[in-house]
């Protein structure tokens, strides 16, 4: 479980593509403190298990589905990624509850700069509209955000200067892809009793 408060921006050291199981290596410092093999770390919002740790580089194994259904398959050496360690029992939840299971990948359609913030407009992937509501929670690349506007086939979020500085969202451009995880509470409420 995560809460969408990015602890560190890491750097992709390598993405070794293999037939069924690819290996991602990420360079970081802060999130490695106290981290051991088997721990979960969200990489751009995707929950991955640490399989190896050396100095300032940690390694993950990724199934083909992870590469195909998230933006991680588009990563290249030197790319920046948002990192967050799993929540600790008794810790604060400053964002919202997130599982690290990505619902879809969306594309940034527009980036508008205002005096004190920026608005990102994201193309809404099919089937997610019912989970995206104004003032509701959504995660983009592992960053907990509040939905600003919802329109036909798109939604917007607002980025304050701090969020732009401490996450990769500050450097995203029109046309870039982002991992989307909708609010887990909305999923449970809307799906309650469907198959019971």
Predicted regions and their residues:
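Conserved loop->alpha-helix
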Residues: 1-196
